[in-house]
């Protein structure tokens, strides 16, 4: 898992990225929706299938890539902040524009701003990239584990006291999406109650990217491959155990990203 001397690329990360892209192609082009192979379908609510590993893997990859990229400038905010803000805006706007174009191709009609979906996959990637990258150049990295714990536990408490585990309009995640985004700007016009890439569920998504960032730090900081493998294996096993135990209180759910989801699925990456 070392960086090659000529290209300065992390081969293991490129391999994981390639596997994830292949998985995305299979999931997004699985054939007729009613006849797709079951493992290529997303879980409808609680639980997860192999298809649900794709997006979390991208989040993990982004976290590792953020460390590798900002490490080149020694995490100097004066050098990096303009690039971070520009890239964040570009990713977010690209996501909104792509949704608008695809909607036109599918229906032949232009979506107005009144019913254009605001959030989405690229939008979430852009938001998470921007926040984690800004934290990386402004906050001591040793505080990242604490921030991750605060984000995950805080999100769990919001769900616990806000009916956050039910698929209904009274779910706090749904209520915030309705209030901030508006029903017409949500996934499927709000018919699914929650937006899979909504406002509150972005909180644990940020933690996912931060976990990838810390793994990138291990890969760069530990010069011996054996040491890298041991440390990452210990982290991965620990996260799996924590996620498994916590799943009894908060079952795996990709739409809401319960606290058990970032820990268990990130250990697989």
Please identify what each model-predicted range represents.
Residues 2-12, 65-83, 214-231, 248-255:
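Juxtamembrane membrane-water interface segments of multi-pass membrane proteins
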Residues 54-71, 125-134, 201-221, 239, ...:
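Specific transmembrane alpha-helix
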Residues 51-57, 72-99, 103-132, 136-155, ...:
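Transmembrane alpha-helical segments and their boundary/interface "anchor" motifs
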Residues 2-75, 80:
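N-terminal signal-anchor module of multipass membrane proteins
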Residues 255-269:
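Residue-level detector of conserved catalytic or cofactor/ligand-binding positions
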Residues 141-211:
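Long hydrophobic alpha-helical segments that form multi-pass transmembrane helix bundles
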Residues 10-37, 90-103, 131, 241-246:
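Kinked, hydrophobic transmembrane alpha-helices enriched for aromatic residues
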Residues 30-49, 102-118, 167-179, 184-195, ...:
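Membrane-interface interhelical loops and short amphipathic "cap" helices
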């Amino acid at each position: 898992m070392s960086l090659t001397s000529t290209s300065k690329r992390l081969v293991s990360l490129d391999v994981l990225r390639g596997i994830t892209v292949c998985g995305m192609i299979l999931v997004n082009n699985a054939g007729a929706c009613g006849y797709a192979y079951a493992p290529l379908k997303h879980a409808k609510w609680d639980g997860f299938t192999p298809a649900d590993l794709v997006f979390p893997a991208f989040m993990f990859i982004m976290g590792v890539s953020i460390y590798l990229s900002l490490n080149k400038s020694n995490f100097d905010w004066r050098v990096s902040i303009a690039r971070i803000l520009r890239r964040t805006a570009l990713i977010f706007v690209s996501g909104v524009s792509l949704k608008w174009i695809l909607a036109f191709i599918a229906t032949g009609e232009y979506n107005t701003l009144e019913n254009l979906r605001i959030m989405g996959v690229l939008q979430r990637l852009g938001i998470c990239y921007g926040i984690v990258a800004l934290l990386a150049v402004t906050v001591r990295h040793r505080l990242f584990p604490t921030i991750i714990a605060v984000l995950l536990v805080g999100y769990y408490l919001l769900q616990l006291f806000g009916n956050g585990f039910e698929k209904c309009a009274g779910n706090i995640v749904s209520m915030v999406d309705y209030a901030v985004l508006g029903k017409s700007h949500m996934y499927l016009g709000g018919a699914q109650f929650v937006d899979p890439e909504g406002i509150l569920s972005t909180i644990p998504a940020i933690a996912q990217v931060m976990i990838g960032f810390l793994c990138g730090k291990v890969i760069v900081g530990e010069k011996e491959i054996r040491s890298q493998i041991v440390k990452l294996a210990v982290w991965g096993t620990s996260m799996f155990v924590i996620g498994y135990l916590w799943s009894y209180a908060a079952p795996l759910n990709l739409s809401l990203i319960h606290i058990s989801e970032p820990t268990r699925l990130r250990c697989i990456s």
